[in-house]
Regions:
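Nucleic-acid processing machinery
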Residues: 1-27, 39, 46-53, 62-64, ...
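Conserved small/polar residues in nucleotide/adenosyl-binding loops
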Residues: 368-372, 384
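Short hydrophobic alpha-helical segments enriched in small aliphatic residues
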Residues: 375-377
Length: 384
């Protein structure tokens, strides 16, 4: 690639990004494909086929960051990685659809087509935060992988603009994330990505609140960790006594989630009772999942008094995005309410990777097509 295409700081990021993408993507992308990608991207850069976006970001680095995020968070997928790297070259006329179809296959061409369709739709609509636009987006995309790539690309962008000098641009992107991309991530079951998008959006639009909550969480980490350990200890002993195979851990809720609770409950952080959740993940065959989840439920609720009004049973009726879990809130030590989530390892994969888990881990390529169940998901409220 021509040296002037990369600024000095960008060149410093390029090699680590390449290595990371090779490491994460090696299971799905052959070395020969990586070599061909490198050649076509280099040719595109030398021909001036890439255009920096309105933030002045290097499109090659942005595409690579999105591909890296895809592999890291959802698992590597050859066609999605190739599509995100070739999309800009196709959009700006350097690489024809026929060439992509011939050299990279129909699936890559289909994803690139979808990205072009939603980009065109995006450029023609000013009210991108409306429910109508989200439904149009899902209709035009046709393929769930297109929406997933849009979401991971936006997360890559959000990470990249932390120190951007134009605060208005940063605010615009952050607000767009909060009313379009985070709700889409939620509706596809990409909860980890949704949380990071919302945290970054809060950080950029209300840095003072973000910093205050982060500081308070850091201040109270030791006492919170000790409480979680005390809560878990008897539960763990009883689960082991019952012969269950499991992993149990505590996690602090996201900063944006805590801020929403503070606003909803009209309280400061000291008086928010569910700053963290306990997660029990059972290693169990699919046919025994529900029985063992309910057994774990009975163990926890025998030990700690439950709040029946806060039971959320997504075992009997999973969410439309595939999410399955039992959520309960119990009265723990020191008179504190504690949320406990109970699920199997299979359910945990779906909880982390959302609808992507269905087509990737089941090998069901037909499920990449957005269908009526996903349309139903698009009408769900943005928070659970």
């Amino acid at each position: 690639m021509e040296q002037e295409f990369f600024y000095k700081d960008e060149k410093a990021k390029l090699i680590p990004l390449c290595r990371s993408l090779l490491r994460y993507g090696r299971e799905a992308v052959a070395n020969s494909d990586f070599a061909r990608l490198k050649a076509v991207v280099k040719a595109g850069a030398e021909a001036g086929a890439y255009h920096r976006d309105r933030f002045g970001l290097n499109p090659v680095l942005r595409n690579m960051s999105a591909a890296e995020l895809l592999c890291e968070r959802l698992g590597s997928d050859r066609n999605m990685i190739v599509a995100v790297m070739l999309y800009n070259l196709n959009r700006h006329g350097f690489l024809s659809r026929e060439t992509i179809l011939k050299e990279w296959g129909a699936d890559v061409a289909k994803i690139v087509d979808g990205l072009n369709k939603v980009s065109t739709l995006y450029s023609r609509h000013s009210l991108v935060g409306s429910e109508n636009f989200r439904n149009l987006l899902l209709t035009f995309a046709e393929d769930i992988r297109v929406i997933i790539l849009m979401i991971v690309d936006r997360l890559a962008l959000m990470r990249a603009i932390n120190h951007h000098p134009n605060q208005q641009y940063v605010n615009d992107v952050a607000y767009e994330v909060s009313y379009l991309y985070a709700p889409l991530a939620h509706r596809l079951g990409l909860y980890g990505i949704k949380s990071e998008l919302e945290d970054l959006s809060l950080k950029y639009t209300n840095r003072e609140v973000f910093t205050q909550i982060a500081h308070k969480l850091n201040e109270t980490k030791a006492s919170r960790d000790a409480y979680i350990a005390d809560f878990i200890k008897p539960v763990k002993a009883k689960l082991e006594q019952e012969g269950l195979k499991f992993e149990i851990k505590g996690r602090t809720k996201s900063i944006s989630s805590i801020w929403n609770k503070m606003k909803k409950q009209k309280n400061d952080i000291e008086n928010i009772y569910d700053l963290f959740a306990i997660r029990i993940i059972l290693d169990v065959p699919k046919e025994r999942e529900k029985n063992e989840c309910w057994l774990a439920y009975s163990i926890v609720t025998d030990m700690y008094r439950p709040n029946p009004s806060r039971l959320k049973d997504w075992l009997s009726i999973p969410k439309s995005n595939g999410y399955e879990s039992l959520h309960i809130t119990v009265y723990g030590p020191e008179n504190k309410w504690v949320e406990v989530q109970i699920r199997s390892k299979r359910m945990d994969v779906i909880a982390e990777k959302g609808l992507a888990a269905h087509w990737k881990y089941k090998g069901d390529r037909k499920s990449t097509r957005l269908n009526s169940s996903h349309s139903h998901a698009s009408r769900m409220p943005a928070s659970a």
